[in-house]
Amino acid sequence: MEKLVYFDYAATAPVRPEAVRALTDALERFGNPSSRYEYGRQAALRVKEDRETVARAVGCAPGELFFTSCGTEGDNWAIRRGAELNPRKGKHIITTAVEHAAVLETCKDLERRGYEVTYLKPDRTGRITVEQLTAALRPDTVLVSMMLVNNETGVVLPVEPCARAVKAADPAVLFHCDAVQGFLKLPGPLARLGADLVTISGHKIGAPKGIGALYVKKGVRLRPLLTGGGQEEGLRSGTEATAQIAALAAAVRAVQGDAGRLERTAAVKEYTLSKLREAVPRLEVISEGDAPHICAVTLPGYKSEVVVRVLGDRGVCVSSGSACHRGR
């Protein structure tokens, strides 16, 4: 079989060897963290240590970080429960038209349940401004949801100044950030963004699929989305996925230990764009100076699905949109 060249890390990243080793080791340590005997205590201690690792990377306290199955679960939890947190205030939500489907489809479902949602439209470069957001605020606004990095274009949205502006205008408005594409891909901890709720996912940084986390800022009384045995301090029921959690923590340590990764990624993007411009003079670049790990271009006169198919036939893996929608 022809060797494949993989260019779609925004869809998922290969599982890091460190994560594989941690996963395998944890699978052999099979105890349930809720059990009170030795196997359970060992598992609980491992989860505690892994939570501390991920929390440090996010920039929050371990008690503010709750493990989930994926970014979609985190987004659903944050938006559905965040929107209902202050029912007397109102039922108005603000988000952007370029969010991940986990946010957009959840907002559409809430619209069917009586909420009103304002979708901020980006300019032709994919950007949203602070002024757009503050102009959309209303007395009945209860929640704002804005992604950090767009998974298709690589545009970095102004989450930090937007969160600051929202809190200055109305501290009662909750601010959620889907940071799945930004976690450990941009400098600085996510907690500095000033959001009340932040979603992350493991498989974008080399952990296996099936593990993510939601940062819930201290003082935000979010109700659980999943009820049952009361795991995760009663906020996310279900036996903890100890092996996936261990792999996530291992991936976090591996990424953080990779000195110069951001500069190296930016250099690869710059090199790729320079070669593409040489080959295709009419190439149009989207978000050239934004996220270093996403390179989005358009080829005037060519249909994207044709380009994807032709490159795929030659062993080059690229996408024409979000792989979070089936078949793209």
Task: List PLM regions with ranges.
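Pyridoxal 5′-phosphate
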Residues: 1-328
